[in-house]
Amino acid sequence: MAGLLKESMRIKMYMEGTVNGHYFKCEGEGDGNPFTGTQSMRIHVTEGAPLPFAFDILAPCCEYGSRTFVHHTAEIPDFFKQSFPEGFTWERTTTYEDGGILTAHQDTSLEGNCLIYKVKVLGTNFPADGPVMKNKSGGWEPCTEVVYPENGVLCGRNVMALKVGDRRLICHLYTSYRSKKAVRALTMPGFHFTDIRLQMPRKKKDEYFELYEASVARYSDLPEKAN
């Protein structure tokens, strides 16, 4: 429940996985305000550094995976905050237009004033001469996730654009969010949108990265036609 969450919450993240067969581990620490929808994270690669691929493909598993820090307007039930103290999980498949695929599973739990994230990722089929494996990407454009409930699961569908020089590499994201609480204990939100701006203000030698995200959940601003 939202009462367990404070205006300032800490974050700890533990990530491991492979991308095109390269094994790595990352650890992150950060903080944010769950009620204003802003968060920051500082991430170190603890194994497998320097990464031989663009960290940009992992960034959405960190911040865009940190769904407690989404500002929900008053009329939208907050699925994620309702899920505490038990927490929630999500699974995501990201398909890039050049054939690369990234799958991820994340577990979110709460320990005192700290949110704990455990993330496992698997990246396959990224072209050796593509921008991901050549580390030629330059961050993400802002995007909007379409969110809706289905059989007790919150589904997210998104199209993201990775900046590559003067062009964009497009990818499609399919996410399933599952509360650890029984569905009957939740008030599920209706169809809505989540606007996301994910940035990387700083990185160092492909082994240290700083991320910032702002996100807000909203209904459509467009009025319905009167009868």
UniProtKB/Swiss-Prot annotation:
Keywords: Chromophore, Luminescence, Photoprotein. There is a cross-link at E63-G65 (2-iminomethyl-5-imidazolinone (Glu-Gly)). Pfam families: GFP. One of its GO terms (biological process) is bioluminescence. Changing A2S: In Hcred; matures at 37 degrees Celsius and produces over 6-fold brighter fluorescence and a homodimeric form. Fluorescent proteins have become a useful and ubiquitous tool for making chimeric proteins, where they function as a fluorescent protein tag. Typically they tolerate N- and C-terminal fusion to a broad variety of proteins. They have been expressed in most known cell types and are used as a noninvasive fluorescent marker in living cells and organisms. They enable a wide range of applications where they have functioned as a cell lineage tracer, reporter of gene expression, or as a measure of protein-protein interactions. Contains a chromophore consisting of modified amino acid residues. The chromophore is formed by autocatalytic backbone condensation between Xaa-N and Gly-(N+2), oxidation of Tyr-(N+1) to didehydrotyrosine, and formation of a double bond to the alpha-amino nitrogen of residue Xaa-N. Maturation of the chromophore requires nothing other than molecular oxygen. The precise stereochemistry of the tyrosine has not been determined. Changing L122H: Produces a dimeric form. It comes from the Eukaryota. The modification 2,3-didehydrotyrosine is found at Y64. In the wild-type form, the chromophore matures at 20 degrees Celsius. Mutants have been selected to mature at 37 degrees Celsius to make them suitable for use in vivo and cell culture. A synonymy between H.magnifica and R.crispa is controversial. Non-fluorescent pigment protein that is lilac in color. Belongs to the GFP family. Homotetramer. This is GFP-like non-fluorescent chromoprotein.
